[in-house]
């Protein structure tokens, strides 16, 4: 909560509706800093609410996307949403101050000339136009969020289907027994059931509800992923190297989503690594805030001009051989997941020397207990 300014000033009550991972974003951290440090001419009160804990706020304030900042007082209520909440707020504060001065003097503005040639009616129309533009931007954000979620979930559906198909093939060839086969299929069906619930959530555009960050052993998750992909690399004489320190700290992340990122990166590495090649999975913690995960391969590499584009939505690079189909939506999904966790993802590659994808994950620091302070003070990972 922010309480700014001497008593006796007009109250400015704000409600910030944002999930835990959103509070670490640059815009919201800048917003809190602005409210704490700047003299806005109001007695400022800021409350923070997590929509995953208080979903009724989304309906109460008719929010279609978060994060959102709501001005509760002075009336009328206003809602700011999107990726530039701070700039929107800075644009409106002077207007609120002017309205407060006029109200304090007991004046009632009429359609008389203001600011030289602009009438009060014109100013009101301008304000209404700004509100309409804001609502339009919010709707556009909602549509884009729905598209991203649909692509993410649709892409993720391939993983359990592929695993179930491989298990069926292995069982027919006598490589696994019936108990092992049933165990694999059962777990994959459970995954698809969870994904079907995600698809239902897409219609509400509540991205944060698809993530459940918690204390997580990333080394164990990576071991499960490597075992799951075993059939893909054993038959091709591809060596998998791992470098994971025994003292690797636990991370604060969603288990399903981290598994999805590792699967995507390792599948891409296997796709582009030829027979007899190698893939390296490494994890390290250079600071007390971030674990750095790298997946490197000995494939053909990625052209310099494409290394930024591969993380964009709807970008698919041309295939490099009959066996590969090009980097698709998987990398854009990885980027979204990593960024929602507050981290970064990037690639280092040279032609004919392979590619190395690296992403960062926040270290567990009791976020589930005191998440408010933790995420507000947490910065972005260094490259």
Swiss-Prot record:
Segments passing through the bilayer: none
The name on file for this protein is: Adaptive-response sensory kinase SasA
Described by its record, this protein's role is as follows: Member of the two-component regulatory system SasA/RpaA involved in genome-wide circadian gene expression. One of several clock output pathways. Participates in the Kai clock protein complex, the main circadian regulator in cyanobacteria, via its interaction with KaiC. KaiC enhances the autophosphorylation activity of SasA, which then transfers its phosphate group to RpaA to activate it. In addition to its output function, recruits fold-shifted KaiB (KaiB(fs)) to KaiC to cooperatively form the KaiB(6):KaiC(6) complex (independent of SasA kinase activity).
How is the subunit organization of this protein annotated in UniProt?
Homooligomerizes. Interacts with KaiC. Participates in the KaiABC clock complex, whose core is composed of a KaiC homohexamer, 6 KaiB and up to 6 KaiA dimers. SasA and KaiB(fs) compete to bind to KaiC.
Indicate where the modification Phosphohistidine is found in the sequence: 155
Q: Which Gene3D superfamilies match?
A: 1.10.287.130, Glutaredoxin, Histidine kinase-like ATPase, C-terminal domain
Question: What's in the keyword line of the UniProt record?
Answer: ATP-binding, Biological rhythms, Kinase, Nucleotide-binding, Phosphoprotein, Transferase, Two-component regulatory system
Tell me the name of the encoding gene: sasA
Please spell out the taxonomic lineage of the organism that makes this protein: Bacteria, Bacillati, Cyanobacteriota, Cyanophyceae, Synechococcales
Note one Pfam family from the annotation: HATPase_c
Which InterPro entries did the record assign?
HATPase_C_sf, His_kinase_dom, HisK_dim/P_dom, HisK_dim/P_sf, KaiB_domain, Kinase_SasA, Sig_transdc_His_kin-like_C, Thioredoxin-like_sf
Q: What is its EC number?
A: 2.7.13.3
Reactions it catalyzes? ATP + protein L-histidine = ADP + protein N-phospho-L-histidine
Task: Please name the SUPFAM superfamilies in this protein's record.
Answer: ATPase domain of HSP90 chaperone/DNA topoisomerase II/histidine kinase, Homodimeric domain of signal transducing histidine kinase, Thioredoxin-like
Q: Which organism is it from?
A: Synechococcus sp. (strain CC9902)
Q: Which residues form a coiled coil?
A: none
Taxonomically, the superkingdom here is Bacteria
The Gene Ontology terms for molecular function here are: ATP binding; phosphorelay sensor kinase activity
Q: Where is the Histidine kinase domain?
A: 152-365
